[in-house]
UniProtKB/Swiss-Prot annotation:
<dbReference type="GO" id="GO:0052874">
    <property type="term" value="F:FMN reductase (NADH) activity"/>
</dbReference>
<keyword id="KW-0288">FMN</keyword>
<dbReference type="InterPro" id="IPR019917">
    <property type="entry name" value="RutF"/>
</dbReference>
<dbReference type="Pfam" id="PF01613">
    <property type="entry name" value="Flavin_Reduct"/>
</dbReference>
<dbReference type="GO" id="GO:0042602">
    <property type="term" value="F:riboflavin reductase (NADPH) activity"/>
</dbReference>
<keyword id="KW-0560">Oxidoreductase</keyword>
<comment type="function">
    <text>Catalyzes the reduction of FMN to FMNH2 which is used to reduce pyrimidine by RutA via the Rut pathway.</text>
</comment>
<dbReference type="InterPro" id="IPR012349">
    <property type="entry name" value="Split_barrel_FMN-bd"/>
</dbReference>
<dbReference type="GO" id="GO:0006212">
    <property type="term" value="P:uracil catabolic process"/>
</dbReference>
<dbReference type="GO" id="GO:0008752">
    <property type="term" value="F:FMN reductase [NAD(P)H] activity"/>
</dbReference>
<comment type="similarity">
    <text>Belongs to the non-flavoprotein flavin reductase family. RutF subfamily.</text>
</comment>
<keyword id="KW-0285">Flavoprotein</keyword>
<dbReference type="InterPro" id="IPR050268">
    <property type="entry name" value="NADH-dep_flavin_reductase"/>
</dbReference>
<dbReference type="GO" id="GO:0019740">
    <property type="term" value="P:nitrogen utilization"/>
</dbReference>
<dbReference type="GO" id="GO:0010181">
    <property type="term" value="F:FMN binding"/>
</dbReference>
<keyword id="KW-0520">NAD</keyword>
<dbReference type="InterPro" id="IPR002563">
    <property type="entry name" value="Flavin_Rdtase-like_dom"/>
</dbReference>
Length: 191
């Protein structure tokens, strides 16, 4: 979890039997944005297309900021920039589907990661409707159909905590990860 700038004072605990105030408060160094982004490029992550459909309409975007939170109840999180054009749609619909891509689906990832109109994004693949009403990619490695249970804002992003209502796995796909600012196929079956 990212720590807001106004909380960046290091906590201090004095050793037992030392007088109060024996330790000095220290301020943590803040890493600049480019250094942070360069370091994050070293963390490989699954490539996902996040979709929604509901009262606010249909939308989707590419994301790698997705991870498991807990298995009791099954919950994952998705990070979404509040400045993104799709943010109002996800914010109103309160449902989403995390579609984890397989190797070979890089063009679809690029399409959903750009400025392509929504109808053209969705026309580029085959979709089913999940239990929440969200589009579920037929050829996804795995799809997690979810309801947004909680939203926490940190910096420029909202962290969407998503209660999983259904999971669909593809039979024998190969995985796709984003690492060092490029796509990489996993060389053996992922499921």
């Amino acid at each position: 979890m990212a720590i807001p700038a106004n909380f960046l004072r290091a906590c201090h605990v004095c050793p037992l039997k030392k007088p109060a105030g024996c330790c000095k408060e220290q301020t943590m160094n803040i890493v600049d944005q480019q250094t942070f982004r360069d370091a994050m490029s070293c963390m490989g992550a699954a490539v996902n297309i996040i979709t929604t459909d509901g009262p606010a309409g249909r939308a989707g975007f590419t994301a790698s900021a997705v991870c498991s939170v807990t298995d009791t109840p099954p919950t994952l999180l998705v990070c979404l920039n509040r400045g993104a054009s799709v943010w109002p749609v996800f914010n109103e619909n309160r449902t989403l589907c995390v579609n984890t891509l397989s190797a070979g689906q890089e063009p679809l990832s690029n399409l959903f990661g750009g400025k392509t109109p929504m109808e053209l994004r969705f026309a580029a693949a085959r979709w089913q409707t999940g239990v929440t009403g969200c589009p579920q990619l037929e050829e996804a490695l795995v799809s997690f159909d979810c309801r947004i249970s909680q939203v926490v804002s940190v910096g420029t992003h909202d962290i969407l905590f998503c209660a999983i209502e259904a999971i669909h796995r593809h039979a024998t796909p190969y995985g796709l990860v984003w690492f060092d600012r490029s796509y990489h196929a996993l060389m053996r079956p992922a499921c």
